[in-house]
Amino acid sequence: MGAPAERTGTWAEALLTFIQRYPGVHLREIRRRLGIPIGTLDYHLYRLGKRGLVSVRMQGGYKVCFPETLIGEGPPIPEPDKVLIALLRQSVPRSILLHLYLEGTASPQLLGAAVGASGPNLSYFLKRLEALGVVEREGAPGQRQVHLNDAKRIHEILLRYPPLPETPVDRFVRFWSELHP
């Protein structure tokens, strides 16, 4: 675990700024990144929610947080985008969409190898992305191909809502796994 972020204001201010910068972030990731004790985090999320500044909801087994107003960008995030953004905070769905965006249509086997996902894990996320209308699988079993339905929308969301910055531990794990595949 990395060191908690240095505080310059209150935990509520740090929390709101973090959620505005990284909408759809998971509760445990907030705790890990900001070093806020879980009880304090729950308290401040409740208070910010009561003030209409953030919303917290369960999605895919995770508590995810969204700002009700973005920093300097006006209206709240549209509901269909919230589901996709929260999914993109997870590495496998993000890798799937980035691969399809950059490389184009791919078979599930090629996609699984490219993103480092097992068959069941890949299938789980493809079903979720397909239910959102983001990807489509076509063809007979054994000859299936996966493609993006709206590459422009994915591009806009990926640019507008950047991934969380890599921590030193994340970099070490990535480096180590590249050296020892």
PLM feature spans:
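A short acidic, leucine-rich amphipathic alpha-helix
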Residues: 29-32, 110-114
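Short capping segments at the starts of secondary-structure elements
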Residues: 20-26, 103-107
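Long, low-complexity, charge-rich intrinsically disordered regions
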Residues: 1-21, 47, 58-59, 64-89, ...
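Histidine-centered active-site/metal-ligand motif
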Residues: 26, 44, 125
